[in-house]
């Protein structure tokens, strides 16, 4: 991208997209916000249902879905930017997707993670270790990490493990 330009990104946990009205409202909201990239977590679509997620002006929609209606992540890239896809990496459980490509000859990588509720710190650590060779200064990592980083972020009095503390 040229100097002085930016990439606008929205990231949302949508808590399921199986209801048509919810998909329609989400599509309208994305169009109104008008970002270049939109990352969705917890889409909960089965692989055979992913064609149901459509947004006018967004042909590049990439999913990672489990076999059941659990987890699921998506990266949507607006038609307004000339994003050339080079590589897509997904996990089979639908917890992360990585899209590598370029915008105006400049490499970009977007990683969208939805960590499982149980074992989230270990999952995040392992995922980042697995993709370490793909991460560089042009990598954007977003997600729902299901991990409180400070006691203030926790709703219960449960002790926070040292590995997740900031």
For every predicted segment, state its role.
Residues 1-166:
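A shared catalytic/ligand-binding motif for oxyanion handling
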């Amino acid at each position: 991208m040229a100097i002085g330009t930016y990439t606008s990104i929205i990231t949302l946990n949508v808590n399921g997209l199986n209801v048509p009205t919810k998909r329609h409202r989400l599509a309208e909201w994305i169009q109104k916000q008008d970002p270049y990239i939109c990352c969705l977590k917890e889409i909960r679509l089965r692989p055979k249902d992913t064609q149901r997620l459509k947004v006018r002006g967004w042909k590049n929609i990439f999913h990672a879905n489990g076999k059941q209606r659990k987890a699921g992540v998506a990266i949507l890239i607006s038609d307004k930017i000339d994003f050339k896809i080079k590589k897509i990496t997904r996990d089979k459980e639908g917890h992360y997707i990585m899209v590598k490509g370029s915008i105006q000859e400049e490499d970009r990588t977007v990683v969208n993670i939805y960590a499982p509720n149980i074992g989230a710190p270990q999952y995040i650590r392992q995922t980042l270790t697995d993709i370490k060779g793909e991460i560089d200064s042009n990598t954007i990592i977003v997600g729902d990490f299901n991990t409180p980083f400070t006691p203030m972020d926790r709703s219960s009095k449960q002790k926070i493990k040292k590995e997740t503390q900031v």
